[in-house]
Amino acid sequence: EDAWHTRYQDSMRADGLILLGYGDWTTYEARLRELMRQGTHFARWGSVSSESSGATIGSDNLGAGRLVGEHLLDEGRRRIAFIGHADGHYPEFAHRYDGLCEVLRAAGIEPDPALQRDAITTEEAGLSATRDLIASGAGFDAIFAGSDLIAIGALRALAEAGLKVPGDVAVVGFDDI
């Protein structure tokens, strides 16, 4: 199993690999270093980091989080929830959340931990996290979903609760589906 990439490269079916990941690149960093050591050509889609191995293609997630925060504040939103893992294991989500928090603090608003819910990038996770957020009574007027799939689940939960989008709650997704 550990030599899959060598067998693939030796087959001459491709000149290189494109590796897709969503936060899980940290788990496979040792394998990526091994690919480099063996001379396997690859590019990785994911969070850009100075510690990551190989060529990386990704988004400016921190900057995007700032833009979302600025947009929602410009729209008059002040209680902005974030749905998506904000820990380091999902660096894309964490950077988006960090950008949002920077903008909130610059506007004199301390981010409320009660408005953050962990969710992986699925519709069901967004649905569940938003239901939980609504049930908590924390009170929010916007949701920044870490991905569009999470946002779709959030929209379903808001509709179930009789909340109007964007009237009662603004929703922003990420990924452009």
Annotated model-derived regions:
Residues 16-18, 79-86:
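Short beta-strand segments enriched in small/hydrophobic residues
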Residues 1-70, 74, 135, 139:
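Alpha-helical recognition/docking segments in bacterial nutrient-uptake
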Residues 104-111, 136-139, 160-166:
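Short helix-capping segments at alpha-helix termini
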Residues 169:
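Glycine-centered flexible beta-alpha turn that most often forms the glycine-rich phosphate-binding loop
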Residues 1-4, 23, 57-67, 83-129, ...:
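Hinge/beta->alpha junction and helix N-cap segments in small-molecule ligand-binding domains
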